[in-house]
Amino acid sequence: MKKILFSMFYSILVGEEPDSVFLKKEGKQNQVKMIWIAPSSCAKDLTISEGTGATFPFHFHSRVSICFHALFLRPRNMKWTNSFS
């Protein structure tokens, strides 16, 4: 089982045959942080942990919508994008 800690809510729709999902944070001076989630390489059951210590088991299947927290706080001057590969 893998655990991921997130701190801001985001929604991602994973397609039928997902290779990976990226959350990208773009900031000043071309600094970019990315979270990479590859459902095909994760265990079928993934535990998502909150900062409060609460954990939620999550089962990956072919079509799934994931709501989760992002790893970093979003400053006002930063832009968020979702991309699928």
Swiss-Prot record:
Belongs to the ycf76 family. GO terms for cellular component: chloroplast. Keywords: Chloroplast, Plastid. It comes from Zea mays. It comes from the Eukaryota. This is Uncharacterized protein ycf76. It is found in: Plastid, Chloroplast. Its main location: plastid.
